[in-house]
Amino acid sequence: MLFNSYEFIFLFLPFTFFIYFYLNKKRLTEVAKGFLVLSSLFFYSWWNVIYLPLILGSMVFNYCFGVELNKENSKISKKFILILGIVANLMLLGYFKYSDFFISNVNFIFNTHIPHLNLLLPLAISFFTFQQIAYLVDSATGGGTKQYDFLNYCLFVTFFPQLIAGPIVHHKEMMPQFANLKNRIINYKNIALGLFIFSIGLFKKVVIADSFAVWATNGFDKAAVLNLFEAWATSLSYTFQLYFDFSGYCDMAIGAALLFNIKLPINFNSPYKALNIQDFWRRWHITLSRFLRDYIYIPLGGNRKGRLRTYVNLMATFIIGGIWHGAGWTFVFWGFLHGVALVIHRIWSELGFKMNKFLAWFITFNFINITWVFFRAKDWDDVLKVLKGMFGLSGIVLPNFLEAKLGFLSKYGVGFDGFVERVGDRNTFLFLLFGFILVLVFKNSAEILKQLKFEIKTAIFCSIVFIYSIFSLNNISEFLYFNF
């Protein structure tokens, strides 16, 4: 079930909301929690019920391991239990997500012909795997998981607003909210805030992101070759599509959770305003950055083992981050590039160099935009097609109306024709300009939410945004991070 679907907005969400609070009103607290877990599992099963046993088995397995890790006088080594638990989780993720990638590489290296398994990736497996690994690690290190019962644990893992594509929540920020007595009563302020931010997220997805998606798809998947302007229109369209799609999803998740008086962590903080790559990762997919830092980078030694080890740890962390996103060498290389950029930034900072703010932003944004090409491309041919175009190696074409004044450029190989016809039209660049204005000038959703005043004009604005988005739900599309 998609957030941007009629059945979710007009059936599932209101039904779940009213039944949950009705049960709480009758002081059937545990029943209400159980209902919310069952509703979340129904929400998860909407795509493919065949994987329902997978998430159920995963929860039972990890909860039991957590209980064992919390025992003070366990007969089995905690280190052994933790390693076994982490390995089991990673093997499950690896089997479904990376089997065909592994087989492809074995076939290439050894010239074999092992058939692919062609497994359907279980929804949200990357997210609930990381979430539960963090739980196991904290259970082993005294991270305050001892008091959780199985029902609360299930609610922590399955709570439907964050289940499918994050944010990657931590038990310490979720469990106390589920236990808070005040959160069992309808809070009209939270309803207003939730509906507002949900509407903003819906608008981001169906009006903005899905518009950019058309041009990104044309460039990456349909065009055989791209000239300079087409290539830049393609890469920038995907850069904005990904941001508005994923941040739109997170806004909708935050809004839906607020209806139940649950505050999810902020996952985006105007990442395209970043002035360096470290700043970007403090603003983009914040909960993933937190997980990578706390459960990979710091356990590897962080910055406590000397400069060289710090650089190696940064590289390893972001290569793992790349692999987590997808089973392909383009994802690995994307993670590698970000690791290299972070190492260069650290060296630059250690040397005490400074840079003009605009230049710093320009370099950072273009690095991010170029590396998203590796993230989006289906294979290396698509990468080369887009990058060749971006660097002018596939020709430069200007609009026909400029030929009268700039015709002399034709002797230098510049053509005059429909300069973005394989991707979009002139409106594409107007929309890209609109995208830049939105991400660089306007406040982000979290900032708006903090300063929101309950006024008539706010209600009117929210209503217009919501209604316009609803009427734009002609072609319902999945969120991009559902594939990760």
What does each model-identified segment do?
Residues 1-439, 447-483:
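Membrane-embedded transmembrane alpha-helical bundles that form the catalytic cores
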